[in-house]
């Protein structure tokens, strides 16, 4: 096996994001081809040739820079097939390799003039303004060519370092400096634009400033102290990461791989392209125009205007709309910049990296499952057969029901009874994980034992709803299948719903009846004033046991809120114990009968309870019988 076929694994502890130096930006995009040629700089705004539909050389889709657009084929077609792997075509300079390299190979644009990075300039807080200790408004005046800034006062007495000067003020000073009778030997130096900003940042001695600020903090109070702390925090971060402040001003900008900003041909022959290509094209056009103006020694005012336009083009590329007018495309729609692609719910991180679709997972609406135990959930058969398909196929082959995977899949598609039987065996004891977004605490994802149910909705026990913050008004939940034995064990031991009774935040019970359960319990035990209380001994309203009442209710001989007399020898919790009975009489056999508002008790001559009938509703009988039954089973 050759080394080229070996996949190397790089293990790392963390990922760190920091400011890239101009050299690193160029290193990202610069490559030396096997023939020694250095490529990487994008110099032309063209994308593809509309006649040949091939990428233009040195353009935004250049095959020499980013790699071939077709596997193992150079631009001119001289080399085709995998046998020419690694060869660089002498005619077109394209390396013969896989086209997927166009997903990770970068380029760069060498800028004719430095530009400020809009994140550090216009972010909140503005790190450039904090480091230089200049108000943000003044920094913007410098960057966007509205004001000059003093870089060196020279021998001029009235000027201060970092002082802002308007065009007229600087002209007056120039006249004074260059006058015949001038005594100024060392001329003051002023700058404008991102070049001046870069010079100011280069002049900063961070270690010395940090020492001075620490001394100043000890004697400061209130708002001034807070401002100093903010500044020293930024300086310490620069020192800790070995980053230089002048890196916040860009000399080169990276061009992301072409397959991440594609251009596709539509049916009518037209092309649809990523907004980034338009933004990059604006930058390249303005950069090339500025380079040409500098080359022909154009007037300073024209060059300065072009530099400002280049700054605005780079701002729009990095974060469109952060400053100035938003760049719009067709239909007056704002173009999506690099920041728009990264940030927000639909951005690269939340949508594509954190919100990835994973195998062995499903999603469906949840409905209440009143007959489930707390550690169980109802899993639709249609979903279960899809999630557990590899396990089912393995068992079908092992039990000699089918001979191969293809036959097993056909049997599964038919929905054969044997398949359902095998599925039942597979899910027995195999926990699944249910997750409801947003997962704000650890109980947002819990393990359950699946029970096969009909329909297409996941059934959930109502008691676990508070932990998930779920209700049954259309909420959806995701299902995940733990595959490894360790994962299954962990799910069963730690994540099973019946093991998560208490809230990890407060220590109080989180498994509490809510919504449907509270309403159902109230409805079941509610007293209806319009139902007449029966007399004791009424054959249709007197029952020998709780079970008899439930049978009569299920047989529809009695309603849920009707009053009934029922024999019950257990304890009754009511307020009548402290009062005297309404009636008490001795019977011929020596026993005693006591009548209360809601019960009739019969005692023998030794005052032992012989029988007790209570007056209650059918709903309360159902509730009590269910609770007694549950408690006796545990």
From Swiss-Prot:
UniProt catalytic activity: RNA(n) + a ribonucleoside 5'-triphosphate = RNA(n+1) + diphosphate
Keyword annotations from UniProtKB, A to Z: DNA-directed RNA polymerase, Magnesium, Metal-binding, Nucleotidyltransferase, Transcription, Transferase, Zinc
Pfam families: RNA_pol_Rpb1_1, RNA_pol_Rpb1_2, RNA_pol_Rpb1_3
A GO CC annotation given for this chain: DNA-directed RNA polymerase complex
Chain sites annotated for binding Mg(2+): 471, 473, 475
Cofactor: Mg(2+); Zn(2+)
Record-listed E.C. numbers: 2.7.7.6
Segments traversing the membrane: none
GO annotation (BP), single: DNA-templated transcription
Gene Ontology MF: a single term: magnesium ion binding
Cofactor, free-text remark: Binds 1 Mg(2+) ion per subunit.
Transcription listed as a keyword: yes
Similarity remark: Belongs to the RNA polymerase beta' chain family. RpoC1 subfamily.
Assembly mode: In cyanobacteria the RNAP catalytic core is composed of 2 alpha, 1 beta, 1 beta', 1 gamma and 1 omega subunit. When a sigma factor is associated with the core the holoenzyme is formed, which can initiate transcription.
Entry-linked PANTHER family: DNA-DIRECTED RNA POLYMERASE, DNA-DIRECTED RNA POLYMERASE SUBUNIT BETA
Protein name in UniProt: DNA-directed RNA polymerase subunit gamma
UniProt source species: Prochlorococcus marinus subsp. pastoris (strain CCMP1986 / NIES-2087 / MED4)
Gene name for this UniProt entry: rpoC1
